[in-house]
Amino acid sequence: MFKFRPTNKDDASAILVAFSSVFLRFALAFSFLSAVGDRFGFWGSFGEHHVAWGTFARFVAYTGQLNWFLPKGTITTLAIVSTCAETILGFLLLLGWQTRTAALFGGVLLLLFAITMAGALGITAPLDFSVFSASGGAFLLASCTEFPFSIDRLRRDSSGQA
């Protein structure tokens, strides 16, 4: 695993990488799951503080606003697919199972979201909501080779791999 008391610069770096990968994994997971929860009213009704949608119907309308260039008939399907993807990615990242793949797909999903936000609402929208930063973080997580406190780590350790 890793030592909690670094004895040299390499140990300190390993601790920082391990902490960062766990922190980033959880931050992305909870961000995906929180956004999904908002669509189903878990955080309250539309108009309440920190509630973006409050209902799935409002999220579908927002999906249509961002994807104005797509045929209207595809918007509900896109909203459902993106919600399913965010739910699955959120749980995969939370558990640390197939972490690299989940992080890569999460980075792509967030990048597409940032691009459509910029096209529909202007460049400040994805910048103000740190969507490009989250996408970059997901891509960085996908580049990690170790995932402490994860199913991936448990599976690797139980298989005897180094």
Label each region the model flagged.
Residues 1-58, 65-68, 72-88, 95-162:
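Extended, low-polarity transmembrane helix blocks
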